[in-house]
Amino acid sequence: MAKQQIIRIRLKAFDHRLIDQSAREIVDTAKRTGAHVRGPIPLPTRKERFTILISPHVNKDARDQYEIRTHKRLMDIVDPTEKTVDALMKLDLAAGVDVQIKLT
């Protein structure tokens, strides 16, 4: 039995609306070209919290807290055709989305 070829796509972004829109575009493009898509699977959101002192000298109680959330999605495209790969390469995604593509 031949092993299936899988394209694994990981998306990262700070804005969840942007990452969901990009995931929809990838899924629509892959389905239009006849590939089977698993996902998008939401992965755990990474939350980085920073606490900064407001006062330059005294008043240690005066602080601001900031948070950066990194949203992630995972998609598998099973048995992609040549047409699917070409369409995904030509796809223009939003600037705030980091895309990692892995062939297995």
Swiss-Prot record:
Matching SMART domains: Ribosomal_S10
Gene name linked to the record: rpsJ
Protein name per UniProt: Small ribosomal subunit protein uS10
Disulfide bonds: none
Description of how the protein assembles with itself and partners: Part of the 30S ribosomal subunit.
Sequence similarity: Belongs to the universal ribosomal protein uS10 family.
NCBIfam families: PRK00596.1, rpsJ_bact
Annotated function: Involved in the binding of tRNA to the ribosomes.
PANTHER family found in the cross-reference section: 30S RIBOSOMAL PROTEIN S10 FAMILY MEMBER
UniProt superkingdom: Bacteria
Keywords assigned: Ribonucleoprotein, Ribosomal protein
A single GO cellular-component term on record: ribosome
GO biological process annotation, one example: translation
Span of the signal peptide: none
UniProt cross-references to Pfam families, sorted A to Z: Ribosomal_S10
Species this protein is from: Nitrosococcus oceani (strain ATCC 19707 / BCRC 17464 / JCM 30415 / NCIMB 11848 / C-107)
One MF annotation (Gene Ontology) recorded for this entry: structural constituent of ribosome
